[in-house]
A protein has these predicted regions:
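Secretory/endomembrane lumenal or extracellular ectodomains immediately following the signal peptide
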Residues: 1-74
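Short amphipathic alpha-helical segments and their helix-coil junctions
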Residues: 56-70, 113-116, 144-153
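Acidic/histidine-rich alpha-helical segments that form the ligand environment
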Residues: 124-164
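Helix N-cap / loop-to-helix initiation motif
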Residues: 72-73, 105-109, 144, 156
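Histidine/lysine/aspartate-rich catalytic loop segments that bind and position anionic ligands
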Residues: 98-124
Length: 186
């Protein structure tokens, strides 16, 4: 870990406001994995964002926007997030979202295959579209036209845009976690 975990009692004023908002959001949207220490300190990507509130606050606003009233089903979202986390080999990201995906009833076989960077054979139609979409984006270049059309057909224009922003956000989350070598909790 390259940054010390910030204790809530040691936060500057600008960090305190962000901390309180993050705590509230974590409680309502990010359960099922360890994201807050017993002393209230935030783990995962939230700690680096607290260190730099001028960057952390707008990133957190994007997170809140993307998790508020999503149009995409939870299992589909988790496939996109796991494809992204696996691409970046982001340990904390994979730890957290494997636990979430298990709660959303994605099979162990499906999860382990995605984490290995491969396409599971038992993906549903929507999951398959998302797998190809997220894989193409994280591997760089323009999203292939047929992949884009398949997403629009499956999720509509707004759902496709949401999927793009979701993958982009989790690229940023994964890079943040990797930059600061954020570990999986003990």
């Amino acid at each position: 870990m390259r940054l010390p975990v910030l204790s809530p009692t040691a936060l500057r004023d600008e960090q305190k406001l962000l901390y309180e908002d993050m705590r509230k959001g974590i409680k309502s949207h990010f359960g099922g994995f360890e994201s807050v220490r017993s002393d209230g300190a935030l783990l995962g990507p939230w700690n680096p964002w607290l260190h730099e509130p001028k960057f952390g606050k707008p990133i957190w606003e994007l997170v809140k926007t993307i998790v508020a009233n999503p149009s995409l089903a939870s299992p589909v979202r988790e496939v996109a997030i796991l494809v992204t986390g696996a691409h970046f080999r982001s340990a904390y990201e994979l730890y957290a979202h494997v636990l979430i995906a298990e709660q959303r009833r994605l099979s162990d076989e499906k999860l382990s295959t995605i984490i290995a960077g491969q396409r599971p054979t038992d993906l549903t139609g929507p999951e398959g579209v998302v797998y190809y979409f997220a894989s193409a984006l994280v591997n760089g270049g323009v999203l292939p036209e047929l992949t884009y059309r398949a997403a629009v057909k499956e999720f509509g224009a707004n759902g496709t845009a949401e999927l793009s922003y979701l993958v982009g956000l989790y690229c940023m989350v994964s890079i943040t976690l990797n930059t600061f070598d954020v570990p999986v909790p003990d």
